[in-house]
């Protein structure tokens, strides 16, 4: 334990173990408590060595005692432990911790002579006089003295942190409590926070960063005069290298005070603000009012998040005035906008007080359902026959029964019978009309009707009188609506059920389906009482109003749309709806709308389903021989699991997913990410493995449509196909491969698995299948409307026509109905009828098109990824903004750079970006295509080989573009012009289906001169030549034939690859020569230098002969510019020549001047080091027939030469070069077999792991001879396992006896099955091949077998480690011995345990198992993890067994786990 062993020695250690943790307790102190205390001191900046003496312990106690009243349990335990150690050093005998505490405190008070310096909890925060204020630094007698912080202040700070959990209130609380504090006091406050070590670490990092910045901004001045106070460093301000007196002097010295306290406070505030943001991650921009959330709750959340924002008050004021209203829900936003500009918070709260409450929700629901419950339109004549209200008591019009002054009639107002009143009427149905009852029933008289019929008729009889005509008219109008209820058993339709549905016959179906374009309101009969009800899949229960079901009910309070409702719950009630009779539970109460919830809908067999397209799914299979993905689901956070569960349940309800059966073995990982608005989650599935094994698909649509290719039309409409992929069914046989799993937190429940029923997002087949389906769906529409332009790319559809507004809308409606009828949705929020139309990144108008707003990013620091995005935006803008350039921007990110690497801007790139910004500031517009006009393309050459072009019809520009791609380092304008024309031609064919007429800046003669030699450029469309300056010209004159009478130069260059030294020179036919020495060059550069020398030393006309294809290719291309310095010099020299003839000859072929110059420049440069090794390698191969790798390794010749030696050997070309690779096995495993050659028996043994063989000829295939060979083999090599076939010689008693004696495990295979002993079978074959190669070198078969074994063991290299079999076997045996030695050595480590610290965490962890102890580090196994820990952070302790494990301070006796204080 290092220094900690010296804390207590001998007798003191024995005395420690006698002291009890608590009075009369059983547990006593142990050495581990001292170890723990020494570790804890590091947290307070105190040295461990202080524990070794009485005085050191006193210093520790002086530091800790002010913190004890407000400190954590760890701090109190540390204080108590130090008190006990102090008593042991003072030779004071104590029995327990409490006695040691009292004794230590009394001694300290007596030694100082006053109790002033011992902090007391009852001490006031401020002096009684009040003059000094609540400042730790106060003035007394003209001097500044330091008053430690009171426990009350520290306690307030600790409670603030614990209660607010680093909420927004912590920062102002710290500012108030630390006013006037020194760094010493602030450190005391930070040390009081026992928990929240993550936050403390963040604050420490901020302190270190700020201290480093302070040191950088305030360098150390020169030497100071004696006695002068030094300037504070960053560590001084942090209080780690300065005393309290120094801090006070810096704060109050004259002149030039340094407020170290305030500076340190500011650093801490920065750290606290970072902690607040970490503990309160909600951004103020993300605080939005929910659709059902009250405004007051939203305001509370808004201001809580606003307090956490560390920004200027003016910005907070702006946030309050704008964001508070902007992020409110639509209902509150409507109210708030009516309050005018800058309303007060009180006005906003008052105005929105009722918004979102139960009463408003009930009112909104009633208004929304008013239309659904309003009777259908009735004929005008019937509508005129409205009757005045009539009293049920006296039969007169003009008043109701409640207002009637006449004596009350006897009998029931409901059925007309006497003996009971209406409230107790046993009849379920009023008998005087076939119409609604309850609150909606018309108030009709009980007396006779005007037609003389009895109003108290049964429901089966037709109504008469005016009221009967009204209901008859309404029923007729309902039938005229044509609404249908679709049957699930055949798609049949039936008229919507009316109020007399039971009397119309059984027209209902077993499983009704409702289209939800309108609210599904039907008539139900509850105990034969008709009621209009809404089928509500979102409601759990069913509630109706206006009916009586008797007294057999249970009172119940339920939460409804109008708040809490008192209801009566009836069970087992008979309900007839849609011609089906069921019994269910129903409630009656005062509800704004009658609803049937899921309890009844489930009984009826109904569910809410999303219609999937009625299309035959396309059969999809996996690639041949492939199986579906079987990847495990990785762990997810609880938040993501809940989001995925919600998404999957919704998709399952909508019919897009179904639960996977337990027999499905496939799985693909799933995860979730936040959408752009950061409020909703998006489910993603990693289909990479499924995409890899799925069959390939053809990309049907290779690009996106361009607006310049659209014909000009009067009317345009844009619509979107919602949930496009989720509307196309996936083939049923393929669904099993899309299975995925939703994990559960802590494995609390079995994981739920799903498969896709529709096309999944992220699967490679979805785009192709969707596009194919959409083409099939839209093809009939296109044929039926040939005058309509229909552009479809994925889920975006554009319809354009010259029809009238009504006809255009009609055709759009037809398309929507076509898509809706097949199960596709066309969301209204993405339906665009009026310009401008947002389409595919463009902005469309009837007569023009533009790009959507382009905003270039503004950044201080640019990374490679930022530049890539910037160039992408500029390239997108270049299709309509002429003059956009990106050449110098692209140069910024040349080479191998990571995406996050910072980019250094050049002046040219900055100028290019500024020029592009100016271009983008001027808005540009494009025109639409008119087929009758000619299509033209004009090409313009700008500076730096950047080309611009525009495609136009007359003066109307359809689109523009740029070209700056240079495929070669050295190029010329004509070649680039051909590439530009090629690009424009392909682009025009794709967009318009025709090639434009070109206007090019080149003369016909120039083009044809270049074209004659360079006709290989892939494809160039025909054009008319129109010369527009600046013209492209060829800069120098290359002739095709040698120039007679002119000096001829033979050039060559050479370079040494190791030293990078080279020579360049030439020889002429007139005897001249010149050689130049080069440094740090290459062969190509040397060849170019030689060519440049020939040009410089020649006349106006010259013939030059080169042997470099590289130089010939550059010069023949007639470049006009290059990035190479030498090539630019060559271009300048060739421009000055009248004529140049350049030819190429092959090198090293003995051609005249070329051979001479080759010798001239090769002296001392070119070295062929391996030539003398080729002949010995050939001799080696002729003797042993070594393989390529052995020759390369032994003789150091190139692999190409070694391969040539082997290929020229007739014996080695029978089967070609063997495929290397060994099957790894245990070191003691051998295989043995017998083979026959030339009538002799050869026994062969092979070491499986290395391929090493032993073989010899035996006289007979017997057990005795085999046993002798095995004994000989075991005496040479370690063998633990022998595998043979089950031949009689291997299964004999002799072999078994030898195997038993040596300790060999024997196993058998099948004699004629090569797989059972494949290694030795293959080696038999190789041995015979080797024997055939060297058979002529020996007479007897015995000799040649041993020679062949030597060749195979020592002359063939390859396989594992690129070694020979002999080298490999010896290496394996050596490695095995080393491993055994290390294992024996490391077995002693198991007796020790290791406690360790990680990173900056000061807490000790462990114990771990010691695996290895090195000089600088130890290797520790903790659970399943293996860690490497530096020796200085590890403590190795012998494991005595049976002791309590110590992994952190919380396991100390007397710590918080026992709830007791040491």
Swiss-Prot record:
Residue sites binding Zn(2+) per the record: 1181, 1185, 1209, 1212
Domain annotation RNase H type-1: ranges: 1043-1166
Extent of Basic and acidic residues compositional bias: 472-482, 497-507
Signal peptide per UniProt: none
Classification via InterPro entries: Aspartic_peptidase_AS, DNA/RNA_pol_sf, Gag_p24_C, Integrase-like_N, Integrase_C_dom_sf_retrovir, Integrase_C_retrovir, Integrase_cat-core, Integrase_Zn-bd_dom_N
Enzyme active site: 536
Polar residues biased stretches: 448-465
Zinc finger (CCHC-type): 389-406, 410-427
Segments of the chain annotated as binding DNA: 1392-1439
Free-text comment on the cofactor: Binds 2 magnesium ions for reverse transcriptase polymerase activity.
Motif (Nuclear localization signal): 26-32
Residues reported in the UniProt entry to bind Mg(2+) 2: 1052, 1087, 1107, 1158
Name by which UniProt lists this protein: Gag-Pol polyprotein
UniProt organism field: Human immunodeficiency virus type 2 subtype A (isolate D194)
